């Protein structure tokens, strides 16, 4: 198994393996094989991965302001 994976990545791998009725090891092999063969990884899988980095959302710095919706 791959060592030092973030806990969120491990959890996502366990969920994906269960969804595909695979062991965690078999799912990891399938992901690596697909990645090396150029198959795209679905966006939800990428978003579920915990990269270990936090992103700060700063609306003011981005120039975003609240607006009243026009109905």
UniProtKB/Swiss-Prot annotation:
SUPFAM superfamilies: Ribbon-helix-helix. Keywords: Toxin-antitoxin system. The gene is vapB14. It comes from Mycobacterium tuberculosis (strain ATCC 25618 / H37Rv). GO terms for biological process: regulation of DNA-templated transcription. InterPro entries: Arc_rbn_hlx_hlx (IPR013321), FitA-like_RHH (IPR053853), Ribbon_hlx_hlx (IPR010985). Putative antitoxin component of a possible type II toxin-antitoxin (TA) system. The cognate toxin is VapB14. It comes from the Bacteria. The keyword Hydrolase does not apply. The keyword DNA repair does not apply. This is Putative antitoxin VapB14.
């Amino acid at each position: 198994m791959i060592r030092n994976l973030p806990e969120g990545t491990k959890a996502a791998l366990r969920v994906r393996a269960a969804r595909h009725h695979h062991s965690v090891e078999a799912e990891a092999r399938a992901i690596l094989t697909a990645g090396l063969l150029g198959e795209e990884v679905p966006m939800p899988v990428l978003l579920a991965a915990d990269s270990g980095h936090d992103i700060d959302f700063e609306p003011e710095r981005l120039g975003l302001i609240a607006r009243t919706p026009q109905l």
